């Protein structure tokens, strides 16, 4: 959801980032029950008294279990950094083991890599109907994510005292991503489908398996539902999470040039700023032609959207899915698009990315979004707005554009907070203004989406529906 990040305004700040609010009494992330179950299974598989299947089948099951252990520990690593590594199930009498000191980041990342390498080598599935079963590509993709995070964290936090260098981890990230790129048969979804090539990835009940490597699948017949509409469309549950304008400004124009190159970009109306932009923008927020229950609708600024940029990326376009766990669309956990971005960033950080690799990764993602310019060759010009607003310490136009692309492609997928932490950009959560759509003036009706119908009437401190 990215509920804790810089690019989304929320009605209430998470206790995790409130000073003094997150402690041992309130923490919900210091749970080890899942690891106990995983290690119990691993220990049992490795004990011939209990596991009597042949070695290939056993190693397949071990690979799956070790993937889940890596998933568990990656969350611990990003949340806490150094944590105790437990390779086996702990018994209640083993207090000396249970209360051991934290292990170093080197210990954690080495074991994460070992688990994911084992999973890649031994998980037998190479494809999955509905992307709901672990495959070896899920192992390689997760490894690229894990290694990229830790490489950047070490580089940008200057952790020179650690043994494993950022360069080593960037190379591991690139190698893992390249395995997926070269061998998995995955590709970007480019069919326009129901809602557009990008939004369909999050709208469909059945995952688009050519791009979605792993997903949580809803199933109406089995009574498995999601909460996306409830979270994004109900004040009673969600946080009114809405994109902020400074981030919306980073979506490129269709010709590949920055929207902020226009002298009057800051005073453009909502309709004007949606025109001729990266197609993902109107597949992420309610745009000019958005239909709700089959009728034209704008962002619910009065009740739900704090900024006027109401997110639709995960929601279904009917009110019957609001107000509870009712969604029947599946949620991607790992996508091929992320793997491409992981590869591009790792290669760029190593200083070895080529024009062809740019075209394969960032260029391909932008082409899907309708962008025509700058997709084949590496960028050579720094976008001053992007640098000034988000990354003032980054001077490489290639890295800046990769960060732009990552933020846009993966928005609301739960990646942004980790990205901010690994790049040492957490201050953006303090400094980036929560600004919304441009309002030309108070005490006058506003037609938000340009359909000729006035939508809102803004006065000081209040928003109401426009008078008929």
Residues of each region from the PLM?
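Active/binding-pocket-proximal capping segment
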Residues: 337-343, 353-384
């Amino acid at each position: 959801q990215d509920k804790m990040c810089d690019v989304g305004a929320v009605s209430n700040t998470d206790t995790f980032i409130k000073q003094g609010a997150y402690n041992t009494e309130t923490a919900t992330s210091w749970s080890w029950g899942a690891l106990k179950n995983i290690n119990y299974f691993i220990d049992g598989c490795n004990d011939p008294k209990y596991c009597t299947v042949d070695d290939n089948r056993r190693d397949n099951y071990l690979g799956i279990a070790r993937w889940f252990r890596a998933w568990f520990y990656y969350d611990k690593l990003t949340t806490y950094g150094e944590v105790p590594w437990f390779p086996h199930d702990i018994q209640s009498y083993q207090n000396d083991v249970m209360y051991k000191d934290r292990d170093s980041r080197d210990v954690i990342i080495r074991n994460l890599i070992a688990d994911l390498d084992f999973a890649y080598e031994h998980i037998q599935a190479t494809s999955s109907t509905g992307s709901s079963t672990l495959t070896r590509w899920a192992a390689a993709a997760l490894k690229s994510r894990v290694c990229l995070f830790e490489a950047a964290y070490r580089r940008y936090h200057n952790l020179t005292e650690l043994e494993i260098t950022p360069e080593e981890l960037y190379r591991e990230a690139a190698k893992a991503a390249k395995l997926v790129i070269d061998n998995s048969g995955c590709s970007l979804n480019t069919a326009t489908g129901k809602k557009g090539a990008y939004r369909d990835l999050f709208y469909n009940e059945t995952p688009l398996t050519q791009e979605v490597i792993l997903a949580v699948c809803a199933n109406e017949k089995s009574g498995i539902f999601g909460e996306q509409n409830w979270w994004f469309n109900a004040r009673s549950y969600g946080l009114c999470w809405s994109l902020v304008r400074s981030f919306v400004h980073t979506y490129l124009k269709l010709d590949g040039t920055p929207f902020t190159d226009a002298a009057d970009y800051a005073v453009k109306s909502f309709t004007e700023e949606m025109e001729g932009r990266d197609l993902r923008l109107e597949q992420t927020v309610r745009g000019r032609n958005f239909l709700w229950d089959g009728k034209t609708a704008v962002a619910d600024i009065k009740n739900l959207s704090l900024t006027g940029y109401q997110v639709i990326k995960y929601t279904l376009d009917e009110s019957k899915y609001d107000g509870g766990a009712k969604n029947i669309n599946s949620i991607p956990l790992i996508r091929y698009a992320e793997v491409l971005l992981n590869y591009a960033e790792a290669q760029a950080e190593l200083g070895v990315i080529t024009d062809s690799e740019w075209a394969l990764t960032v260029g391909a993602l932008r082409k899907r979004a309708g962008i025509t310019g700058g997709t084949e060759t590496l960028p050579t010009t720094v976008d001053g707005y992007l640098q000034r607003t988000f990354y003032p310490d980054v001077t490489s136009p290639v890295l800046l554009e990769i960060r732009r692309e990552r933020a846009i492609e993966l928005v609301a997928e739960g990646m942004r907070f980790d990205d901010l932490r690994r790049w040492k950009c957490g201050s953006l959560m303090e400094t980036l203004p929560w600004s919304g759509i441009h309002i030309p003036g108070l005490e006058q009706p506003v037609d938000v989406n340009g359909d000729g119908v006035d939508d809102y009437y803004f006065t000081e401190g209040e928003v109401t529906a426009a008078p008929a």
